[in-house]
């Protein structure tokens, strides 16, 4: 055969390590490189690709061979062609990457023949392969069966019964979950605080309003209301009225949302009502005022610990306003607690919002009877303690706004500090 009978080499895809050469004739006619093509061509092909795909075009059949070019031991021939399997082909019936039980136990390399590996055949031992696929399928089936097993919802008093109207109590196996409900393993237990009745009634895949959603107390305060919507760690229920299983979500904990802003609003409301307007209405007592000031300052200190909310300007402004409410009540009380000269004091004086603070019950301070001077000393020390705590709180807020370069908030804090200095003098 002459080189003119050989078509130009056509490269296979870049992912393969082969080149293809089409020629006319029968593949058995070429047993060496001299019968195929010149040595220079073979060297060029061998330098580019490791394998050569030889396609024999005949009148009867289309045969394809994969050959490996190797150096020939014959001195007269540079290369020889050896028939080989395609590099991307896998031996049919071979259990690749699966060793027999005996080779696994001895930790030796297994050839993996289906009828028996060479090691077991040589030693005349039974060769068995582990059925990994079957075991995985079996485990998957067991998981599916476990997921559809019986689940019970129980509270602290006992198990939570599930009844279908008109049929009495049913087991989990009798309930058809395929159409409406998807059993969830995480719904094994529920707290009694989440349920308003002792049992859940299923009537045509619907839940009555007396059980779900949960009943909410009518006089619930702002803090509980907001934390119930955002920030609560209670689990959410799936929708029993959904028509398909895709819309029924598993019970999962809601993503936590910080509720410090709601707590700050509640603290602001409490300070406005009990520290400002109660004094104007002459309904505040001195001990209640001191306790309210202490609680308000403690709430603000806890709110400053939230690393997320202190980055919000509105949150910091709200805390500054709360400090202003506390400072105002301290200023009013401090004016009343100062010693007065009965001669120089005017006979008529406009009533201050905190004048009712001096209506003190001796038993509220001590069981022993105290005169007016002792009462002023005790109350003065308590108010001085409130001023000290308030000064520390304002200093912490000042560092916060200075670090973030909030100029307006800085001026507000400095105004509060100047008012605190006036109380000390």
Swiss-Prot record:
<dbReference type="GO" id="GO:0000981">
    <property type="term" value="F:DNA-binding transcription factor activity, RNA polymerase II-specific"/>
</dbReference>
<dbReference type="GO" id="GO:0008270">
    <property type="term" value="F:zinc ion binding"/>
</dbReference>
<keyword id="KW-0805">Transcription regulation</keyword>
<keyword id="KW-0804">Transcription</keyword>
<dbReference type="GO" id="GO:0045122">
    <property type="term" value="P:aflatoxin biosynthetic process"/>
</dbReference>
<dbReference type="Pfam" id="PF08493">
    <property type="entry name" value="AflR"/>
</dbReference>
<dbReference type="InterPro" id="IPR001138">
    <property type="entry name" value="Zn2Cys6_DnaBD"/>
</dbReference>
<dbReference type="InterPro" id="IPR013700">
    <property type="entry name" value="AflR"/>
</dbReference>
<feature type="DNA-binding region" description="Zn(2)-C6 fungal-type">
    <location>
        <begin position="100"/>
        <end position="127"/>
    </location>
</feature>
<feature type="region of interest" description="Disordered">
    <location>
        <begin position="132"/>
        <end position="159"/>
    </location>
</feature>
<dbReference type="InterPro" id="IPR036864">
    <property type="entry name" value="Zn2-C6_fun-type_DNA-bd_sf"/>
</dbReference>
<keyword id="KW-0238">DNA-binding</keyword>
<dbReference type="GO" id="GO:0003677">
    <property type="term" value="F:DNA binding"/>
</dbReference>
<keyword id="KW-0862">Zinc</keyword>
<dbReference type="GO" id="GO:0005634">
    <property type="term" value="C:nucleus"/>
</dbReference>
<keyword id="KW-0479">Metal-binding</keyword>
<comment type="function">
    <text>Transcription factor involved in regulation of gene cluster that mediates the biosynthesis of aphidicolin.</text>
</comment>
<protein>
    <recommendedName>
        <fullName>Aspyridones cluster regulator</fullName>
    </recommendedName>
</protein>
<keyword id="KW-0539">Nucleus</keyword>
<feature type="compositionally biased region" description="Polar residues">
    <location>
        <begin position="133"/>
        <end position="157"/>
    </location>
</feature>
């Amino acid at each position: 055969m002459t080189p003119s009978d050989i078509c130009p080499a056509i490269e296979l895809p870049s992912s393969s390590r082969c080149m293809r050469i089409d020629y006319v004739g029968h593949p058995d006619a070429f047993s060496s490189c001299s019968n195929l093509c010149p040595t220079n061509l073979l060297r060029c092909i061998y330098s580019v690709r490791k394998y050569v795909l030889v396609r024999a075009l005949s009148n009867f059949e289309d045969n394809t061979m994969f050959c490996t070019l190797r150096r020939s031991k014959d001195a007269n021939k540079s290369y020889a062609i050896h028939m080989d399997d395609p590099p991307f082909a896998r031996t049919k019936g071979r259990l690749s990457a699966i060793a027999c039980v005996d080779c696994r136990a001895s930790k030796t390399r297994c050839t993996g023949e289906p009828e028996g590996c060479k090691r077991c055949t040589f030693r005349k031992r039974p060769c068995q392969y582990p059925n990994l696929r079957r075991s995985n399928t079996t485990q998957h089936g067991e998981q599916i069966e476990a997921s559809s097993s019986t689940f019970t919802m129980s509270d602290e008093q006992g198990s939570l019964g599930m009844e279908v109207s008109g049929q009495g109590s049913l087991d989990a196996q009798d309930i058809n979950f395929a159409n409406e409900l998807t059993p969830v393993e995480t719904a094994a237990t529920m707290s009694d605080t989440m349920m308003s009745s002792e049992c859940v009634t299923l009537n045509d895949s619907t839940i009555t309003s007396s059980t779900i959603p949960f009943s909410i107390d009518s006089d619930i305060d702002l803090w509980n209301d907001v934390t119930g919507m955002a920030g609560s760690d209670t689990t959410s229920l799936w929708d029993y009225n959904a028509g398909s299983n895709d819309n029924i979500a598993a019970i999962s904990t809601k993503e936590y949302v910080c509720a410090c802003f709601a707590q700050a609003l509640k603290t602001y409301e409490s300070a406005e009502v009990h520290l400002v307007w109660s004094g104007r209405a002459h309904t505040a007592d001195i001990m209640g005022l001191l306790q309210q000031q202490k609680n308000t300052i403690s709430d603000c200190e806890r709110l400053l610990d939230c690393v997320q909310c202190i980055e919000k300007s509105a949150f910091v402004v709200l805390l500054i306003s709360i400090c202003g409410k506390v400072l105002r009540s301290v200023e009013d009380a401090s004016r009343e607690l100062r010693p007065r000269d009965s001669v120089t004091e005017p006979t008529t004086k406009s009533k201050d919002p905190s004048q009712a603070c001096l209506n003190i019950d001796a038993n509220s301070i001590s069981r022993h009877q105290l005169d007016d001077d002792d009462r002023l000393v005790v109350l003065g020390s308590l108010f001085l303690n409130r001023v000290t705590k308030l000064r520390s709180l304002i200093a912490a807020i000042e560092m916060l706004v200075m670090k973030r370069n909030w100029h307006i908030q800085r001026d507000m804090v400095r105004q509060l500090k100047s008012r605190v200095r006036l109380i000390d003098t």
